Regions:
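Active-site-adjacent structural segments surrounding the nucleophilic cysteine of cysteine proteases
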Residues: 1-134, 138, 188
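Active-site-adjacent substructure of cysteine-protease-like catalytic cores
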Residues: 143-201
Length: 201
């Protein structure tokens, strides 16, 4: 399932790929502040940012423009007291009104569409919201996509440490050549960041 990490490399038989793949996301380039966080909770009077985990998820969902509607509901209370909930089953995602970028002018419908998606992603992974840095655990992303967004139950979380460098690059190139942008997370002693792999050269 989406929570279980793959600890044994699959046999990847394809080793020949195109020299480069242009970014699958095209011009989609989203951020964590307004308008993306317009429906994120307030904390001590300040609007919280979306968090990199939610932003990375949202860009991939926009790429697929799936689902039309979510599934179920989810709610939680964060350690800082913020209570969050989202009704996925009664939410229709307005893909057509989501812009690739939000620089310049845009309508209320366009800002509402992307803000709704960002909130849906954040709540699905129990985002710990704050005005300056919102965080969530990446291991929750896979199961959230399955449970609330209806993605394939065979979706997998894989860890770099269980693969050789060649196997890892092979896996990344395989996914990208199948036109599947990759949710990716990296961390060090100083912190971590989630982002999207959508091409290579």
């Amino acid at each position: 399932n989406g929570e279980k990490a793959v600890t044994e490399p699959k046999l990847l038989t394809k080793t020949s790929f195109p020299a480069s793949v242009s970014p699958l996301l095209g011009s989609i380039c989203w951020d964590q502040s307004a308008p993306y966080n317009n429906t994120c909770p307030l904390y001590q009077g300040e609007r919280c940012v979306t968090g990199c985990v939610a932003t990375a998820m949202a860009m991939i969902l926009k790429y697929h423009e799936y689902p039309v509607k979510g599934k179920g509901t989810h709610s939680y209370k964060a350690p800082n007291g913020i209570e969050c909930s989202f009704d996925y089953g009664n939410t229709t995602f307005d893909w057509n009104n989501m812009l690739p970028q939000y620089s310049g002018t845009y309508t209320a419908e366009q800002s509402d569409a992307v803000a709704q998606l960002m909130s849906a992603c954040g709540v699905a992974v129990d985002m710990q919201y704050s005005p300056y840095s919102s965080g969530a655990y990446s291991y929750q992303v896979g199961q959230a996509l399955i449970d609330y967004f209806g993605y394939d139950g065979n979706l997998e979380l894989v860890y770099r440490q269980y693969f050789t460098s060649a196997e890892w690059m092979n896996l990344i190139k395989s996914e990208i050549n199948e036109k599947r942008p990759i949710y990716y997370f990296g961390s060090s002693d100083d912190g971590g960041h989630a982002f999207v792999f959508d091409g290579y050269d």
